Amino acid sequence: MIQQLNIHKLRNLEQVELTLARCNLIIGANGSGKTSLLEAVFLLSRGKSFRHHEPRRYIRHHESDCTIWAKTFGDPSNTLAIQKKLDTQGKSDTLLRFNGQTAASQSVLSFQLPTLLIDPVGMSLLDEGSGTRRQLLDWLVFHMKHEFYQQWLQYQRLLKQRNSLLKQPSIQHRLNELLAWDGQLSYYAHALHEHRQEIFLAWATHFQQMLGLLLPEYQHRLSLQYVAGFDTKNPLIDTLKSRIDQDIELGYTRIGAHRADVSVLFKSTNDQGQKIREQATHILSRGEKKLLITALKLSQLQLICNAISHSNSDATFPVVLIDDIDAELDDAAMQILLRTDRKSVV
């Protein structure tokens, strides 16, 4: 966990140096930079802000760069740093360092500093597109299945190449080339699905347990559902072949692991006595949805902390970032959080 945090030229934080405990409560007036402190940790961990993706939006006004540096508990040489820079045209560049050496990619820092964010914006998770929910699952898989990330990168590279080829005017004369890409894309799609499915099943179990604590009246009516994005019973390459004309017409790949989704279903009975399932977001009140999303995230935290505690790995416990704690967590959720992981930044 973070022992020392230095922030330079991030929003209204010109120069901040903090020594942190394992659990921290940040207080201050509105606009004093409380959320920016959380943003700094998230930026260091994920390489992007949870408020704005464009560096020019969070680099201090009239400055060309911002830097976040952190030292963790344990080995005094264990340090992480990220610098976001703007050139004269406003284009951004990123410099990463781990233990004083240049880091090859953001994944190096992400693995060393996992972060779980609970904030007001995240409470719209159920109403957003599938991408946000897929990222929620993939964050968990990334930290529990370390081979997942390289396979995910390969899939994204192949998908980009396939989509580019689909847009070419000469595509009808390059179908054999497309078939070669499809074979590799299919292989990695099924590999990603296997990892996601395994971790999802464990997550779903912890989610049901968390519902019993936060939304006991709905524990047996709500269920977590994972959709792979393609028919996993058959090779993806066969499905891609059968839909090649539609993909060429659209200019992109409509099915695959990139279309995976996670949703929460609400079980009920209609007037004819038939059992039906609907999206929970259409049924629950705003307050109930907030508790539901809290259950999703705390069940993730519980799962990953339990896995680390029962393993011999050097994996790091997640840092939990909570923006506006009174608004986002009720007393029950706060007690669960403190019991689950006492090594978090809050």
Question: Where do the model's predicted regions map?
Answer:
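Conserved NTPase motor "head" modules and their coupling/switch loops across ABC/AAA+ ATPases, GTPases
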Residues: M1-A29, L43, Q172-V320, E328, ...
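Walker A/P-loop
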Residues: T35
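Nucleotide-state sensing region of NTPase/ATPase domains
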Residues: R46-T132, D138-F148, K241-D245
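Residue-level signal for inorganic ion chemistry
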Residues: Y58, L211, V346
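Structural recognition of the conserved hydrophobic beta-strand(s) that form the central parallel beta-sheet
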Residues: A70, R342-V346
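Extended, highly charged alpha-helical segments
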Residues: M123-H190, E194
